[in-house]
């Protein structure tokens, strides 16, 4: 007899917002979502700031969202931990950071600092760069080179000059530091093995073959004149006495989110790297703020805090079968992040990875691989052996990042079509679905003056529980979703999962 599956369906980047202006969620024709919304119990929950372990007012993101959802509690994020360590002064006593600097001082070499130069707070925060500069000054490092990756995605599309000017003011205040290279994150922070992009960033960082400008500002302004926004600035070298990352140097990469920092790190710190031909840097001390992946030989500045009793582990302990399914862009989120930073499958877990389309930007194919994800899930459901399903539709977030309204509306409409087939199938099997999101984005893709808005929002996300006859609490947070799943599965909630079921009892 087929099992009755319980599914968590995450519409990535899909939040509630009253105004229709630039709101693809409101403007899209989504008959299936609306049908479930009108028929079943609903509420909305918080997905940003203190509710997900981020600083107050900080927008949520997919990594943080999935981590909180899977843990069933507030998970204090790297950004919050690092900020606190700087405030407490522990940062300046950190062994790994001090070892990197000791390496430079003993080799009379250079300290290179890599990172995303913005206050987006999703992958990095430029105030962490300032703390590194202060530490280097305190320890008497003379040669400090900053390799800046421009954002334009988690912050305004053309905001780089503000961060560059503030950083140069910090260089002047401390009397150390200079920009050595600048790359748009499209090149330096790819995560889909598009090595031809990373190679351009690598060449600029190694001072090999890249356009050269007198200042960082001049290079960015030239890029703007060519119609490029920060994210897409072609990597360039800033003229100075720096000759790139060399033997005996040290690198500190201050991005704390792993997924878009791993590839560049593999080029420098994975001896088995084969993406393209590289000249290995000898005796390089390579440090990363967090652990990016197992292939990278790096010293870790902030070790991971282990999370036990995530939704996957509880399912395993109760002999339940589970499926994690998403396309490439969100696959790490339904697996690694949902499992609290664990890569290995749990007993009874299987996974389906559907390739994301190979297009330059997803506004060119707003449906992405939603239909293929849906087909794969229906195939899995037909096996009749699943207790728990965790599914992510990437489109509202990934297309929302384009800041283009029409493609984002199309993205949501494609997802809605798939949602209808999936949920109806689950209901036919006497199962339940929780339809929700991890953070906002597609709810505002235009600013009030109709400029593209490519960032996430701090708006609350909807929750639909397809179980008639129950009442949901009026408020909650992402950490309440796993307890709600356990409630539907009739599984006892462990003590360290401190969220509360959204179903009133």
Swiss-Prot record:
Protein's UniProt keywords contain Amino-acid biosynthesis: no
Residue sites binding Mn(2+) 1 per the record: 397, 401, 456
Disulfide bonds: none
EC number from the UniProt entry: 5.4.2.12
GO biological-process terms attached to the record: glucose catabolic process; glycolytic process
Residues annotated to bind substrate: 123, 153-154, 185, 191, 257-260, 330
Catalytic activity: (2R)-2-phosphoglycerate = (2R)-3-phosphoglycerate
SUPFAM superfamilies hit by this protein: 2,3-Bisphosphoglycerate-independent phosphoglycerate mutase, substrate-binding domain (SSF64158), Alkaline phosphatase-like (SSF53649)
Keyword Manganese appears in the UniProt entry: yes
GO cellular component labels: cytosol
Pathway(s) of this molecule: Carbohydrate degradation; glycolysis; pyruvate from D-glyceraldehyde 3-phosphate: step 3/5
Residue numbers annotated as active site: 62 (phosphoserine intermediate)
A Gene Ontology molecular function term of the record: manganese ion binding
A UniProt-annotated Pfam family: iPGM_N
Keywords annotated in UniProt: Glycolysis, Isomerase, Manganese, Metal-binding
Cofactor: binding comment: Binds 2 manganese ions per subunit.
Names of the cofactor(s): Mn(2+)
Binding residues for Mn(2+) 2: 12, 62, 438-439
Origin: domain of life: Bacteria
Enzyme class: isomerase
Complexes and interactors: Monomer.
Classification via HAMAP family: GpmI (MF_01038)
Matches recorded under NCBIfam families: pgm_bpd_ind (TIGR01307)
Function: Catalyzes the interconversion of 2-phosphoglycerate and 3-phosphoglycerate.
PANTHER family membership: 2,3-BISPHOSPHOGLYCERATE-INDEPENDENT PHOSPHOGLYCERATE MUTASE (PTHR31637:SF0)
The protein, known as: 2,3-bisphosphoglycerate-independent phosphoglycerate mutase
